[in-house]
Amino acid sequence: QMCIRDSYMGMIHQPDPEKKPDMLEGILAIRHMHMRVLQETGFSTADEMLYPENLRYLSDIMSYIAVGARSVENQFHRLVASGCDVPVGLKNPTSGDLTVMLNSVVAAQVPHDFIFRGWEVQCPGNPLSHTILRGAVNKHGQTIPNYHYEDLRLLYELYMKRNLKNPACIVDTNHSNSGKQYMEQIRIAKEVLHSRRHSDDIKNLVKGLMIESYICLLYTSDAA
């Protein structure tokens, strides 16, 4: 019996939105997409760690991983982030709580022993784990941006109160920072760059921007 869903859950579940879900084809599709980017551009890829188990299919070709707002408080995501050998960005939760985000960075930077894929693993900690500001949502469902100068200044001060390695922040110009109005990303990017020019502390903290585009890569199972 097939479960009928109202929303599209992503390529790994349903690589062809017009066909039934197919997890095997989905795994092939996501790997093919990452390989195609690498082959055609020469750039290695970044992706969100929605399911930590999927790392086994992509870890050899990715150079950056993000942990999303709804996963950042999950212990398993934090533990796996501590064992990744590439930079891992941890977003603020949808509540906007910066201390939760920084606690996640702390957890990702220290060593851990835990069970992963049925094995006991020891992770040394990831000194390149860092923060991503993506805005917040209040109890009324209204978006609250956190990319302004004052937000970046506050994050810098919170970083300085903690003994964290390699303080760094990426600003997500979409999601709740733009209210999902994608054209606003241009203005937001310019404002963040202005804040970096205005403050050396912010310049040293903010390492880049996360910009959401709507470029579609088509996948067919016979394109190997």
Descriptions of predicted regions:
Residues E157-M160:
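Redox- and metal-dependent alpha/beta enzyme cores, enriched for Fe-S-associated oxidoreductases
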Residues M2-D6, Y219-A224:
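Conserved small/polar residues in nucleotide/adenosyl-binding loops
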